[in-house]
Regions:
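Non-catalytic terminal/linker segments enriched in charged/polar, low-complexity residues
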Residues: 1-98, 104-111, 128, 132, ...
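P-loop/Walker A NTP-binding module and the surrounding RecA-like catalytic core of P-loop NTPases
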Residues: 90-286
């Protein structure tokens, strides 16, 4: 996970080697393969962006912005469009500096997502990052459904030198969070990180469990800054969008951790997510 706040595009580039190469290679072929900026040029460009999983909506917005700038600046040569295109993509992916306020406030960060996306690893890395910034961190191991989830998280907590509160396998996750919230308040913790079960979006009872956790935090820790991060696997492409949509119906999602960015040639999903939902990708995992 990239931890430095260098602006989303810079962090994205670090985690997107394969994707960037493929998309840029495709874009370069358009710029070198056309001698005029016409409908065919824009069509080819759209196709390459969509193939890179940037998605139809984001691609349309990017290309429309490019057309507008080409007209305003009276550009005739396709080669002169490249930087404009990069700027147009950047505009779709801006993350405001206030998006990271939760790192500085007394906060509760709930981390959600389906199984297998790298959720527990993300919690562990985030705990280590915050600890390195001299924040007092506590982890709540509320994934009590999956065998060994607690052990895996305990290993990450130990590595980060951060205390953890967890329940036995099968314990009520909301009660684990209740205990963790009270411990956080008693110990003067800066950041409480809550790891949740891999809530498969077709399991209604698991979604209800998430709502219960939400209510416990709201009731017991009302003055804490709330941050709900969803972990999405970039290799699942457009399927990540449907996962986000399902979880959005259950809780307010404030940011995204996008994992496995080097395992896919279609990391353009990062652009699609932000353009479609306006939810910033705050961390990149590889």
């Amino acid at each position: 996970m990239s931890e430095e706040k260098k602006g989303f595009f810079a962090r994205l580039k670090e985690g997107l080697t394969k994707t960037r190469d493929n998309i840029v290679r495709g874009i370069d072929s358009v710029f070198s393969g056309f001698s005029a900026i016409d409908d065919d040029f824009y069509e080819e460009l759209e196709e390459i962006l969509i193939m890179g999983d940037i998605g139809v909506n984001a691609t349309t917005a990017i290309v429309e912005r490019l057309k507008q700038q080409v007209k305003e600046k009276h550009i005739k040569e396709p080669s002169e469009c490249k930087q404009l295109l990069i700027e147009s993509i950047k505009e779709q992916m801006q993350v405001d500096e206030t998006a990271y306020d939760f790192e500085k406030e007394q906060s509760v960060i709930m981390v959600i997502g389906v199984n297998g996306v790298g959720k527990t690893t993300s919690v562990g890395k985030l705990a280590g990052k915050l600890k390195d910034e001299d924040r007092k961190v506590l982890i709540a191991a509320a994934d009590t459904f999956r065998a060994a989830a607690g052990d895996q998280l305990a290993e990450w907590a130990s590595r980060a030198d951060v205390p953890m509160i967890g329940g036995k396998e099968g314990a009520d996750p909301a009660s684990v969070v209740f205990d963790a919230v009270n411990a956080a308040k008693a110990r003067g913790v800066d950041v409480l990180l809550v790891d949740t079960a891999g809530r498969l979006h077709n399991k209604k009872n698991l979604m209800e469990e998430l709502r219960k956790i939400d209510r416990v935090i709201e009731r017991e820790y009302a003055d804490a800054y709330r941050e709900n991060l969803i972990v999405l696997d970039a290799t699942t492409g457009q399927n990540a969008l449907s996962q986000l949509k399902e979880f959005k119906e259950v809780t307010d999602i404030t940011g995204i951790i996008l994992t496995k960015m080097d395992g896919t040639a279609k990391g353009g999903i990062a652009v699609a997510i932000q353009a479609e939902y306006g939810i910033p990708v705050k961390y990149i995992g590889v």
